[in-house]
From Swiss-Prot:
Residues 79-82 are annotated as: Involved in Mg(2+) ion dislocation from EF-Tu. Associates with the EF-Tu.GDP complex and induces the exchange of GDP to GTP. It remains bound to the aminoacyl-tRNA.EF-Tu.GTP complex up to the GTP hydrolysis stage on the ribosome. This is Elongation factor Ts. It comes from Malacoplasma penetrans (strain HF-2). SUPFAM superfamilies: Elongation factor Ts (EF-Ts), dimerisation domain, UBA-like. InterPro entries: EF-Ts_dimer_sf, Transl_elong_EFTs/EF1B, Transl_elong_EFTs/EF1B_dimer, Transl_elong_Ts_CS, UBA-like_sf. Belongs to the EF-Ts family. One of its GO terms (cellular component) is cytoplasm. Transmembrane segments: none annotated. CDD domains: UBA_EF-Ts. Pfam families: EF_TS (PF00889).
Length: 292
């Protein structure tokens, strides 16, 4: 059967599938575009299913604010190269927008995108088209009230995105400065009053042990550690950290200077954070490909 270049072009335009896949689909579907689309989708779901167990630790984060809501989102791919793919970038943008539209970051996979498909189904289609596992990893929505402000910052082409909810009305520049602090310094807590007790107890125990190993008398170890904990808390608590643009003041002082009271919430997503990446052996990969 002769397959015209125009039909292949039309099918590629509608599905984003590769040239040979489109040609094969038309051959298997008697040159019928609609049947070919269905064939590609069926084969695509099969391909996507095979990718389901793959580790996707690359991708992109984004932070978007609209009105009284702000979303921080991470979408993963298997390689950094794919994270720059136009269809992938559009998917990230569309997911962020639909979260803001629905004012909810719960059950993101079930939200319906402008293409009339759910986020989950669109991710499957992308996985089949691009050839890598695509998945929405996490999303968090912040909502502000009267007298509150957002601060947003995206670093290194979406490698890190951060947002803060500030108690007080500040300029977008001040808000961005605080979000930038979160992105660059990666604080664990907003302030010392929010420090997790279990984390603090474990850190104190480790410091006491280290202090004793350094040869300090056991009876003085706790006093020494108390001073070290004060220093550590200043490092891990956002409001107590020295401002990266002016080490002479802390973040809380910077906020006070700008008529704000405190930081209420902070969110920081870094691509692949906490995901154990598979270290592929090149020779093994070649052998695996040869067996296919």
């Amino acid at each position: 059967m002769s397959i015209s270049a125009d039909k292949i072009k039309e099918l590629r335009s509608r599905t984003q599938a590769g040239f040979m896949d489109c040609k094969k689909a038309l051959e298997e579907s008697d040159n019928d575009i609609e049947k070919a689309i269905a064939w590609l989708r069926e084969k695509g779901i099969s391909k996507a299913a095979k990718k389901a167990s793959a580790i996707a630790a690359e991708g992109q984060t984004t932070v978007v604010e609209k009105g009284d809501n702000c979303v921080v989102l991470e979408v993963n791919s298997q390689t950094d190269f794919v994270s720059k793919n136009a269809d992938f970038v559009k998917f990230v943008k569309d997911v962020a927008e639909v979260i803001l539209k629905n004012k909810s970051a719960d059950n993101v996979d079930s939200l319906v995108l402008p293409n009339k498909k759910t986020v989950a189904d669109t991710a499957i289609d992308l996985t089949a088209t691009i050839g890598e596992k695509i998945s929405v990893r996490r999303a968090q929505l912040l909502t502000k009230k009267k007298g509150q402000s957002f601060g947003v910052y995206q670093h290194f082409n979406g490698r890190i995105s951060a947002a803060v909810l500030i108690d007080g009305e500040v300029s977008s520049e001040v808000g961005k400065d605080v979000a930038m602090q979160v992105a660059s310094m990666n604080p664990k807590f907003v302030n010392s009053s929010q420090v997790d007790k279990k984390w603090k107890d474990e850190e104190e125990k480790l410091l006491i042990q280290k202090t004793i190993e350094e040869g300090k008398p056991k009876e003085f170890a706790e006093k020494i550690v108390a001073g070290r904990m004060v220093k550590m808390l200043a490092e891990v608590c956002l409001e107590e950290q020295p401002f990266i643009k002016d080490n002479g003041i802390t973040i809380i002082k910077y906020l006070k200077q700008n008529k704000a009271n405190k930081v209420l919430e902070m969110v920081r997503f870094e691509v692949g954070e906490g995901i154990e990446k598979q270290e592929a052996n090149f020779a093994d990969e070649v052998k695996a490909q040869m067996k296919k």
